Amino acid sequence: MIVKICGITNREDAQAAVDGGVTALGFIFYEQSPRYIAPEHAARIIERLPTGVWKVGLFVNVAPAEVVRIRKAAGLDIVQLQGDEPPEDLPAEGRVWKTMHVDGPLNTARMDAYRAEAFLLDTPSEEVYGGTGCTFDWSKATGTGRRIVLAGGLDAENVRAAIRQVRPWGVDACSRLESSPGRKDHVRVARFLKAALSEATE
């Protein structure tokens, strides 16, 4: 199972996650986010990361050509589209995850319109694109028949239950692991990773 920590802004937080066994790290290229990181800064962190850790870049309503440019410049493995992008705006090359904000039954026909490797299911908000720290009704995420990365308010206290109920392809945590926006609490990171990885192997 993929265990991703999103909102990485510095080398120390990235290393703490790697030390805990993380399988994917997320870098947010959305300037309105308190977890924004400039692509050139992300590239300097990414170049020191193990090749086995997936580097995921999060974008919100960015033109496909610009997404591809940043993906190459920063050394990303995966592009995560977090905004309101229509299927035709998915980059024509490379691996893509599409975020779906779950406020009711999943529209599987809409999911099928995307050429996405996986779908990240997150809590909806009228104010922000992710990072709410709030969970949603996990029953909406079951039985999709698609690769699901479960997000939205996950931490060490609830990730085991989330995995048991949803059986996702991956889990993603961000704001609940922070000491302040953009800064990870390394104890929370370690506890989350231990809980998620141990549950995934049971």
PLM segments and residue spans:
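Conserved N-terminal beta1-alpha1 strand-loop-helix module at the mouth
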Residues: M1-E202
